[in-house]
C-alpha cells in the first residue's frame, strides 16, 4: 500500500484566529438512519448548539470537526444527507472558517481517503475538507490537521517530519480508554502518544471524552450506546494562544441510565416521569421478581415518557420480553436485538459481518 503523500503535508499560513470550536464523531445516520436518532442529533444542534454558537461566537473563531461526520461508510439516507447539509449551512452562517477532517467512518475505501461522504459538504461556503494532512500557522502556532490514516508507519513518518504546537486529527491512540469498561485502545493501527513529541493533540475517533498524556479526546456531543452510559458529553472550545479550554456540557440530549428495582419502588410515577424523562432506561431485576411485581401496567405508562424502557434479567442481563400490542412496547425481532447489541458494543464492520453470518447459520439449526 503506497501512501507517499503522507510524508509531504501541505503548508499554509493563516492568522488572526481567536478560538477553535471542536466537534467530533457526530455519526449522522446512526443505526441505519433511524429517524429517532437523527431527530435527537439534529434537535440538539438546532435547539442548543447553533444558538450557543451565535451567542458566544467571537470574530476570528473557527469550527473544526475532528472526523466521523457520518456513521455509515457506504449508504447514507436522503433525510440524513439533507439534515446534515442544513446544519452545516447554519454553521457557515456563523463561522467564516470551517474545517472538516475526514474520519474512518467518512471514507468508502479503508486504504484511501479519496472517496468520502464529506465531499457533499465541500460546496458549502467557508468549508475546507482535509483528506490529506495540512500544516498551517495560526496565531503564531503551528497546527497539523491530520485526517484518518490507515497505515501506521506512514503516520509515524508524517509525525516525525512535523514539529507542530497542536495536532487536530482523527486518531487511534494506544492506551486511551475506549469506554466505561476501562478497556484500552490497542489495535494494530494504534499510534503511541510519544510519536506526537511535544505537540498538544485534540482528537476524534474514541468516543469517550478524556485526557491522556498530551492527547485530548473531545468526545461525542451526545451518548449513542450503552457503553457511553455515564459519559459527560458536549462541545469543547480551545483558545489556541493561551491553551485554555471551555466546555459546554450537553444537558439536553437523551442519556442511557441503568436502574435497580429498588430505585423504581422508592419513587412515585410522577417522580419517575420527571427524573428520567428523555432517558433510555434499563431496569435490572430478577426474572422471578418481575413476575411478582407485575410491571406491565407500569411499563405501559412509562413508555410514554422515557425514550426507551427495557427490563433486564440480573442473572444473565438478557432483556425480558415485555412486548405486546396492549402495553404499547415496540416488539423487536431476534435480528433487531442482535443488531442493537452489535451497535451498542461498537463492533467493527468485518467482525459484525462474521457475527451476523454465524447467527444466520445457527438460527436455521434451532
Give a label for each model feature:
Residues 25, 68, 84, 103, ...:
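Divalent metal-coordination and catalytic microenvironments
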Amino acid at each position: 500500500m503506497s501512501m507517499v503523500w503522507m510524508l509531504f503535508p501541505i503548508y499554509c499560513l493563516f492568522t488572526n484566529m481567536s478560538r477553535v470550536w471542536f466537534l467530533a464523531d457526530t455519526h449522522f445516520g446512526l443505526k441505519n438512519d433511524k429517524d429517532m436518532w437523527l431527530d435527537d442529533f439534529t434537535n440538539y444542534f438546532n435547539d442548543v448548539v447553533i444558538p450557543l454558537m451565535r451567542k458566544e461566537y467571537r470574530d476570528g473563531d473557527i469550527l473544526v470537526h475532528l472526523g466521523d461526520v457520518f456513521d455509515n461508510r457506504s449508504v447514507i439516507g436522503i433525510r440524513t444527507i439533507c439534515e446534515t447539509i442544513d446544519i452545516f449551512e447554519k454553521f457557515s452562517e456563523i463561522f467564516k472558517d470551517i474545517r472538516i477532517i475526514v474520519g474512518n467512518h467518512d471514507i468508502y475505501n479503508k486504504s484511501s481517503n479519496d472517496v468520502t461522504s464529506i465531499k457533499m459538504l465541500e460546496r458549502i461556503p467557508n468549508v475546507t475538507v482535509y483528506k490529506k494532512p495540512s500544516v498551517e500557522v495560526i496565531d503564531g502556532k503551528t497546527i497539523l490537521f491530520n485526517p484518518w490514516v490507515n497505515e501506521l508507519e506512514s503516520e509515524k513518518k508524517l509525525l516525525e517530519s512535523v514539529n507542530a504546537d497542536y495536532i487536530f486529527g482523527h486518531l487511534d491512540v494506544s492506551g486511551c480508554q475506549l469506554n466505561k469498561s476501562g478497556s484500552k485502545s490497542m489495535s494494530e493501527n494504534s499510534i503511541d502518544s510519544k510519536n506526537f513529541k511535544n505537540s498538544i493533540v485534540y482528537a476524534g475517533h474514541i468516543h469517550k471524552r478524556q485526557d491522556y498524556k498530551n492527547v485530548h479526546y473531545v468526545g461525542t456531543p451526545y451518548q449513542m450506546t450503552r457503553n457511553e452510559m455515564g459519559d459527560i458529553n458536549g462541545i469543547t472550545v480551545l483558545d489556541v494562544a493561551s491553551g485554555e479550554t471551555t466546555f459546554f456540557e450537553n444537558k439536553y440530549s437523551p442519556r442511557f441510565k441503568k436502574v435497580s428495582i429498588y430505585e423504581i419502588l422508592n419513587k412515585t410515577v410522577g417522580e419517575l416521569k420527571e427524573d428520567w424523562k428523555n432517558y433510555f432506561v434499563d431496569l435490572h431485576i430478577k426474572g422471578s421478581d418481575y413476575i411478582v411485581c407485575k410491571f406491565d401496567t407500569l411499563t405501559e405508562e412509562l413508555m410514554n415518557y422515557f425514550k426507551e424502557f427495557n427490563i433486564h434479567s440480573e442473572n444473565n442481563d438478557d432483556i425480558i420480553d415485555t412486548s405486546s400490542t396492549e402495553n404499547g412496547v415496540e416488539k423487536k425481532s431476534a435480528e433487531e436485538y442482535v443488531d442493537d447489541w452489535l451497535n451498542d458494543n461498537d463492533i467493527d464492520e468485518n467482525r459484525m459481518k462474521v457475527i451476523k453470518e454465524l447467527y444466520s447459520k445457527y438460527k436455521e439449526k434451532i
